[in-house]
Amino acid sequence: MRQRKNVTKFIKRAYRDMGELKQYKRYTKTRLNIISNKVFLLKNELYPLQPKKKRGKRDQQLKTTYTKKKLKRILSLLFRIGGKIYRKKIKKKKINLKKQQEPFTQNLTLHRLFRKFYLNLKLKQFKLLYKKYKGNEKVIIQQLEKRVDMVLLRSGFVRSLYEARQIINHKHLLVNGKIASLPGYMINVGDIISFKEGSMKRKLLKRLKKGLISKKSRKRWTNRNFKFKRFQNYKRKRQKKKNKNKVRATGPNYLEISHSLLLISLIEEPKLTAIKYPFTLQPEKNIKFITLLKKYKRLR
């Protein structure tokens, strides 16, 4: 195959020509490009014969979008093959899922999961804690667990953090008899959390009762006039076995909870062994991902 590597200025671009040129309206294709169009080339790689008129800055920027590297890549492949173009068989690569990830990727995934668990906690808030406590990972996690919205979720009164923040924003929550309108309000040891008397408190009490007693069992306690007492006793024994499987969320050891009065109090500072997450994070071992804030400033 004939080769000509003379660099010429053709519409202000360097190119290599191989074989005979053929014209199709306003586009040129070499013999090489005609053959390899099906395999390698894309439509954007074709270049026009006539230059475009300068209309503005936008048209000037389009000239730089022509890909020279792709053409060089095609030529280098053809030189190896010796003029014959064919598709090589694609070998399937087996991926070992058991293979351990790199420490950076592992820490970065944990960092993102950790922030999403706290409903996309802002980096600004996260970095302030990092500077305040001088990179001590244990203290940072303890301070995040002392937030009001997090204490409500751990207690079991609330199903999600969205619901907890809604209660706080609508000013239904009291801390030591005062309204707490911010979800990031930090609680100290000995503080008591309670709810305002109103419709919100009644809804929570109804929900907690449903968790323990089923609808069928309530009818038995309300309807006292039973004709068949023996049959009634048999049903009660059967129901007790079913209620054993029903469990209420008691909360961690560092919280004291009363379900009847809807009160929460923080007895001691939270420990890492008592904290649990829905994803695979062991705070006793994998806490070092917080140190990424110091090394990599552009984390999102």
Curated annotation (Swiss-Prot):
Gene Ontology CC, one term: small ribosomal subunit
Family assignment from sequence similarity: Belongs to the universal ribosomal protein uS4 family.
Highest taxon of the lineage: Eukaryota
Classification of source organism: Eukaryota, Amoebozoa, Evosea, Eumycetozoa, Dictyostelia
GO biological process: aggregation involved in sorocarp development; regulation of apoptotic process; regulation of cell cycle; ribosomal small subunit biogenesis
Keywords per UniProt: Mitochondrion, Ribonucleoprotein, Ribosomal protein, RNA-binding, rRNA-binding
Location relative to the cell: Mitochondrion
InterPro entries: Ribosomal_uS4 (IPR022801), S4_RNA-bd (IPR002942), S4_RNA-bd_sf (IPR036986)
Protein name (database record): Small ribosomal subunit protein uS4m
Residue ranges annotated for the S4 RNA-binding domain, each copy included: 146-209
A GO molecular function held by the record: rRNA binding
CDD domains reported for this sequence: S4
